[in-house]
């Protein structure tokens, strides 16, 4: 697997990283990861280690979604390497300060947002110190003026291991679809049993106006 981010940061290429172009089409990136051989250990210990490493890489994506959806900007930034780069539909952001400004802006756009990541695929460099992860995402959000929208696209992440923790050093996000949603009707459903307490999950989330 060879990494080649043409026209981006000029990071080193290795003989065993996926041969990918972060400025190419999203399908070239995803197919490049899908076609790369999956790293397999030869002993039980090595195989278990690879299972744990793959789970740790996927955990980065899950933590990113939880932090983003919870409007935790520091948490979002914790998954990125200090020398990180982000490519999204608005342009390229290099360094944590630029990427932080990007996410501060995005988080301010929604009263509530939920991200769902699917079709997650991970491929490792031979020494398991670098990885590529690709995924689809579907996001549902309520804007400040209470419009409900949904968006979909893809993630392509290049990660490296730093002191035992996986960090995103390069990320590309595509934005492929957007549509509006109908809000759920307020109040209880007809015929629903009376709850023991009035406190509801909407009380925990907020006033309920987000829904």
Regions found by a protein language model. Give the residues of each.
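Short, low-complexity N-terminal intrinsically disordered segments enriched in polar/charged residues
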Residues: 17-74, 78
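Short, cysteine-centered beta-strand-loop-beta hairpins and adjacent loop/turn segments enriched
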Residues: 139-148, 179
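Acidic, Ala/Val/Gly-enriched low-complexity intrinsically disordered segments
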Residues: 3-5, 13, 21
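Short, surface-exposed coil-to-beta transition loops
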Residues: 115-117, 150-155
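A solvent-exposed, acidic/Ser-Thr-rich amphipathic alpha-helical stretch
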Residues: 73-141
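Short beta-strand edge/turn micro-motifs at domain boundaries
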Residues: 18-32, 37, 130-132, 152-186
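Short beta-strand segments enriched in hydrophobic/aromatic residues
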Residues: 68, 80, 137-139, 172-175
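Acidic/histidine-enriched, glycine/proline-rich intrinsically disordered or flexible terminal extensions
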Residues: 179-211
